[in-house]
C-alpha cells in the first residue's frame, strides 16, 4: 500500500450487485483498507456516508433508488471524501457527469484488483492534495484580510494619532505582543474605536 493509504483509510462500498460488492470489499480489505460500510442502493449510500464519514467511497453509477452520481453530489454537499465511480459504461457524458459531481476516479467494469486499487490510491491522493490546497487558499485569504485590516488601522493611526507609517505599524505590533493578541485583533480594535468617535 502507498504512503497515502498507510493509516488504513476508511472506505464505504456502494454497489447494488452483491457479488461485485463482495469482490470489491475483498479486494480493498486485502489491499489494507478498512471497509466500514456497504450499501446496495444510492439512498443507503448517502445515509451511510453521512453517518460513517469515510475517507473514500467506491460507488456504482447505476443503482436503484438513486444513481451513484446523484448520491455523490448529495454526499459531497455534506462531507469531504474521495469518490471512485464504477460503471459498465465508458460514455464520455457519464465520465463528465461523474467528474462534475466530484468523483476523483472512474473505473469501467469488468475490473480487477490491478485496476481498482491504483484508482482508489490516486483518488485518495488527489483528495488529499485538493484539501491541502483549499487549506492553503483559506490561510492566504485570512492573511490577506489581516493585512488589509492592519493597513486600515495604520492609516487611521497615521491620520488620528499623527504617527508615521512605521510608527503606526510598530505600535500595532507592540500592542499585539504586550496584550498577547493577534495583530488582526489589535487592528480591529483600532478600527472599531475610531469608528465610535
PLM regions: where:
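Active-site residues of response regulator receiver
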Residues: 60, 87
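Acidic catalytic/metal-coordinating carboxylates
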Residues: 41-44, 65-70
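Two-component/phosphorelay signaling modules centered on CheY-like receiver
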Residues: 17-37
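Short amphipathic alpha-helix used as the core "switch/output" element in two-component signaling
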Residues: 47, 69-80
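Active-site beta3 strand of CheY-like receiver
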Residues: 52-58
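C-terminal output helix
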Residues: 93, 111-120
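C-terminal output/effector regions of signal-responsive regulators
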Residues: 126-129, 135-197
Amino acid at each position: 500500500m502507498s504512503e497515502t493509504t498507510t493509516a488504513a483509510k476508511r472506505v464505504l462500498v456502494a454497489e447494488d450487485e452483491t457479488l461485485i460488492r463482495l469482490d470489491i470489499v475483498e479486494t480493498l480489505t486485502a489491499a489494507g483498507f478498512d471497509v466500514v460500510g456497504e450499501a446496495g442502493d444510492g439512498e443507503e449510500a448517502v445515509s451511510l456516508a453521512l453517518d460513517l464519514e469515510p475517507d473514500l467511497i467506491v460507488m456504482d453509477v447505476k443503482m436503484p433508488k438513486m444513481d451513484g452520481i446523484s448520491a455523490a453530489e448529495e454526499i459531497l454537499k455534506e462531507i469531504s471524501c474521495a469518490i471512485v465511480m464504477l460503471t459498465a459504461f465508458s460514455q464520455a457524458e457519464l465520465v463528465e457527469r461523474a467528474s462534475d459531481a466530484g468523483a476523483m476516479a472512474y473505473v469501467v467494469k469488468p475490473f480487477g484488483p490491478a485496476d481498482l486499487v491504483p484508482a482508489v490510491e490516486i483518488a485518495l491522493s488527489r483528495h488529499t492534495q485538493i484539501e491541502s490546497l483549499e487549506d492553503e487558499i483559506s490561510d492566504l485569504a485570512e492573511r490577506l484580510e489581516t493585512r488589509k485590516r492592519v493597513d486600515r488601522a495604520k492609516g487611521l493611526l497615521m491620520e488620528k494619532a499623527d504617527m508615521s507609517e512605521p510608527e503606526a505599524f510598530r505600535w500595532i505590533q507592540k500592542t499585539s505582543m504586550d496584550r498577547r493578541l493577534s495583530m488582526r485583533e489589535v487592528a480591529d480594535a483600532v478600527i472599531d474605536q475610531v469608528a465610535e468617535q
